[in-house]
Amino acid sequence: MSNFDHIINRVGYNSKKWDACEETFGDKEIIPMWIADMDFRVPEKVTEAIEARAAHGIFGYTGMPDSYLEAVQGWMKKHHGWAIEKEWICHSPGVVSALSFLIDAFTEPGDKVIVQSPVYYPFARSVRTSGRTLLDNPLIIKDGRYQMDLESLEAQLDDSVKMILLCSPHNPVGRVWSREELEALAESIR
C-alpha cells in the first residue's frame, strides 16, 4: 500500500515535472501543476516486479502477452460492460502518442479538428503537427463552472470537421462531463 503522506523530493532525477520548471516557465520555485505526474511512491509490489525484471539483465523488444490482453478485456467488461476482441487492443506508450495515432487514423491532412480550450496543450500541438486545421471551441464559465458551449460548437460544424478531441476528466479545468452533457454533445454532432 502507498503512503500518501510521505513527500519525495524528485528534483534532480530527470523529472520533467520538477526539473523543467525553470526552463519552461523561467522560475524553478513554482508549484508544478502543469503536467499529470504523481508524486507518490509506487506500491512495493510494483517496485519488486520491476527489480525482478531488471535483474534478468536483457532489455530487448517485448511482446504483449495474452495475460495483458486478457486483463484489458476483463477491465473493459467489468467497468463498461464491453466484450472486446484481443485484436482490437493497441498499446500506446502514452496519451499524447495515442492522440497523434488517432488523428492520423481518422482524419486526413487539412481536415478540421476541434479542441475545447483551455485544454492540455499537446491536444492542439498534435493537431497542428499532423497537418490538420485546429478549431477552438472554448469552454464557457456558467454558474461558476466550466461548461461546453454547444451552441458555438454547432455553428462551427461543417463537412470539413472530422474530429472533436474530448478531454474527460478535462485537463486543466478538472470537469468530468456528466452523462447528460455527453448525450447533449453527441446530439450536437450527429
Ranges and model annotations:
Residues 2-94, 101:
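N-terminal small-domain helix-loop-helix segment of the aminotransferase-like
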Residues 59-190:
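Conserved core of the PLP fold type I
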